Curated annotation (Swiss-Prot):
UniProt record similarity statement: Belongs to the UPF0181 family.
Transmembrane segments: none
Record's signal peptide: none
Record-given protein name: UPF0181 protein HD_1137
Domain of life: Bacteria
Xref: Pfam families: UPF0181
C-alpha cells in the first residue's frame, strides 16, 4: 500500500472524498475519480518532500 496515502489526516481524507464526489457529479466514473484524486495526492506529497 501507499504509505503517503495512509498517513492522511481526517481533514485531508474528507477533502479527498469531496473532490471525488465533485468529479463524479461531472460524469467521471468513481474508479477514475479515485485515481485522479490519488494521483493529485501523490504529486502533492512528492512536491512537499522535494522541498524539504
Amino acid at each position: 500500500m501507499d504509505k503517503a496515502l495512509l498517513s492522511l489526516t481526517h481533514e485531508q481524507q474528507q477533502a479527498a472524498v469531496e473532490q471525488i464526489q465533485q468529479l463524479m457529479k461531472q460524469g467521471i466514473s468513481s474508479g477514475e475519480a479515485i485515481q485522479i484524486v490519488a494521483n493529485r495526492l501523490r504529486e502533492s506529497h512528492q512536491r512537499t518532500n522535494e522541498q524539504k
